[in-house]
Amino acid sequence: MGSTDEPGSSMHGVTGREQSYAFSVDGSEPTNTKKKYNLPVDAEDKATVFKLFSFAKPHMRTFHLSWISFSTCFVSTFAAAPLIPIIRENLNLTKHDIGNAGVASVSGSIFSRLVMGAVCDLLGPRYGCAFLVMLSAPTVFSMSFVSDAAGFITVRFMIGFCLATFVSCQYWMSTMFNSQIIGLVNGTAAGWGNMGGGITQLLMPIVYEIIRRCGSTAFTAWRIAFFVPGWLHIIMGILVLTLGQDLPGGNRAAMEKAGEVAKDKFGKILWYAVTNYRTWIFVLLYGYSMGVELSTDNVIAEYFFDRFHLKLHTAGIIAACFGMANFFARPAGGWASDIAAKRFGMRGRLWTLWIIQTSGGLFCVWLGRANTLVTAVVSMVLFSLGAQAACGATFAIVPFVSRRALGIISGLTGAGGNFGSGLTQLVFFSTSRFTTEEGLTWMGVMIVACTLPVTLIHFPQWGSMFFPPSNDSVDATEHYYVGEYSKEEQQIGMHLKSKLFADGAKTEGGSSVHKGNATNNA
């Protein structure tokens, strides 16, 4: 026998007893066998309380991974906006080029959000979020190498695909938290994610200035600055993939193999999403809440820079206030919806949405008409509160439209936000027909007009803004959600998760229904 030190003589890897190291994408909790959670849960294992500063797995860990990854995507998508005064000089961009780039930045995710909805329904939100964040990283790095308007517009379009992480964010929260607190949770996750639009207004000018002071020229400094959001993408993608999990009980693939989760068909999911008229109303509503927020992120820094002759850093700070308001505005919208639902049920949620979004539109008109810096800043802050709170109030209702097709409906609604933004940017901010202040004024008018269809949303079990329920609230709630499954599908138990959701959603009838049920049970 040869020496044990001889190359090839080691038995390492043969006995299977040696310590080994590997990278896994299966997540931290592949499945769950009747485990206890750190938070109180309902029959679906969804958390019934929201502890903001907790990192308990899986619920709160998922919350933090979700909003941080979404915020990272917002930072990169709008990283160019606060640097436009420098970039336009370097690339010789015209107002038309800048407007088209703004449209491109939010148009890319119209398609990707639709795809993300299906990915969440069929594969789970963890894979969808992690892979999209990491696949977007090369496009962020590519911004450093653009040399003309065409390249600038193309790269902004490609980076915009990553905004589809919004869909995985909202879907993920809806699978982890109880319906009675979903408005607050969805609003906080999305609001803190959207806050990236404000963070980037502060971050990118500071990074640019640091690089310039280190010896780089202005036209080189802005290019190097894009490496910061690019690396953030890679880091967050790895964290989501390794630390996240799809459902409270584990990852979707593992639970499907164990028979704990039914594998659905894409055709059925798509059918129930597109044939529900409420879906399309929310697409429109979100187009003029989130959509106008995205449009404003693209123009607000340049607006203050040009109109009031401010320094780039000062304009960036003011513009950051618009995005940073998401820290509390969007959660407040979801929280207000939850509070209204406790007393007035779904009808309270609908009234809350209409009041908040209409108010935001009126403040937007005021912003466009403002003649002084102080007035413009005040009206911008109030407009941001209204628009962002309306986003929170919208996604406090979306999870109730359909249980089976939640992912695709979330994707369609999210895509509506991007489509509305692209259309608004194209009509009001991409040509010389309107000045920026005129564009803001007409955008406010459109917000008010496009919020009116909320009056048409009617749930048979809960009613609408002006009409009461058309069926008994308790029995109709189960029928509404379980009715999305055929008798054959119900026989094999595909409807059971929806039935559990319906049991929890019966509280959307309002306090009068609770009292009625208590009386009957007595």
UniProtKB/Swiss-Prot annotation:
Q: Fetch the Pfam families from UniProt.
A: MFS_1 (PF07690)
Keyword Endoplasmic reticulum in record:
no
Q: Which domain of life is it from?
A: Eukaryota
- Enumerate the UniProt keywords alphabetically: Membrane, Nitrate assimilation, Transmembrane, Transmembrane helix
Q: Provide one Gene Ontology cellular component.
A: membrane
**Compartments, record wording:** Membrane
Any stretches that span the bilayer, and where are they? Answer: 67-87, 103-123, 127-147, 149-169, 191-211, 224-244, 269-288, 308-328, 350-370, 381-401, 408-428, 439-459
* Keyword Transmembrane set for record: yes
Annotated tissue distribution: Expressed in roots and shoots.
Q: Could you tell me what induces this protein?
A: Transient up-regulation at transcript level by nitrate. No induction by growth on low nitrate concentration.
Gene Ontology BP annotations = lateral root development; nitrate assimilation; nitrate transmembrane transport
Protein family: Belongs to the major facilitator superfamily. Nitrate/nitrite porter (TC 2.A.1.8) family.
Q: In its UniProt entry, what is this protein called? A: High-affinity nitrate transporter 2.2
* The organism's taxonomic lineage, starting at the top: Eukaryota, Viridiplantae, Streptophyta, Embryophyta, Tracheophyta
**Its encoding gene is what?**
NRT2.2
